[in-house]
A protein has these predicted regions:
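Extracytoplasmic/lumenal domain signature
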Residues: 1-200
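Serine-esterase "nucleophile elbow" of acetyl-processing enzymes
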Residues: 202-242
Length: 242
């Protein structure tokens, strides 16, 4: 877990999610505001973290320009991470541009405005239309409407909508509270990801229609609530890899 803190001894730190032990971090005398994590450098293994500077997953400082920390977004088709807004837009409700460390500015949504002053948050970032890229929701400058932007960046990757992941779905809900931090999927999302590790518990189960209450559930035949409940809508072939 990568966190930006307000007090000593750590101004920011990467902690073990299970134990809370610090893997690496740095002292800071002041509140550093916000921090972020994502795949912004395709040449570096794993994810990168940044607050004042950019670091790799082992805590080594990288010679990269530090992106903004307003909100991350999965916008590009190469499974990398982008940010909405940035350092040029911290002085008021400016438009929520989508910036990328290698691709440059990928979207400049003119006529829109961000929220929460210096935090520069969009109304929402979420994968609401399917695909695996996220949509960007921004209000118009005159507050007359909300505009939805979706990526047109071509991709050869195929992945179901991120809302199938329970952790990501919860993250979309908490985006609208307090500091509006981005949600992340429970699996490793990056340009070097192994698709075999994406929600294996969903791939390994047939989907069964339960006629008793008209709902769709997913379980193996051995786990059926009682004999004769439902018929499989789709049965995973033996030995199939999806």
């Amino acid at each position: 877990v990568f966190e930006g803190a307000e007090n000593a001894p750590y101004g920011w730190a990467l902690r073990d999610a299970e134990t809370g032990a610090v893997r690496f971090g740095e002292y800071a005398e002041e509140d550093l505001g916000r921090c972020m994590i994502g795949k912004i450098d395709p040449a570096t293994r794993g994810l990168q973290v940044w607050v004042k500077e950019v670091y790799d997953c082992r805590g080594n400082r990288l010679p990269l320009e530090t992106p903004g920390t307003n909100m991350k977004i999965y916008w590009a088709g190469d499974l990398s991470t982008q940010v909405t807004d940035g350092r040029d837009y911290l002085h008021g409700p400016k438009c929520g541009a989508v910036n990328d460390l290698t691709h440059g500015t990928m979207l400049m949504p003119s006529g829109t405005a961000t929220n929460n002053g210096t935090k520069g948050n969009p109304c929402l970032v979420a994968d609401i239309f399917g695909d695996f890229r996220e949509e960007l929701l921004l209000r118009l400058e005159d507050d007359s409407a909300i505009r939805i932007y979706t990526s047109t960046d071509l991709t050869h990757h195929k992945l179901f909508t991120l809302l199938h992941d329970p952790q990501y779905r919860c993250g979309v809900a908490w985006q609208n509270n307090c500091y509006n931090q981005p949600g992340y999927p429970s699996f490793y999302y990056a340009s070097d990801m192994d698709f075999a590790n994406v929600l294996p518990q969903l791939r390994a189960r047939p989907t069964v229609y339960l006629a008793a209450d008209s709902t769709v559930q997913s379980y193996t035949e051995a786990e059926a609530p009682q004999t004769g409940w439902g018929q499989p809508l789709w049965r995973r072939p033996r030995g199939a890899n999806l």
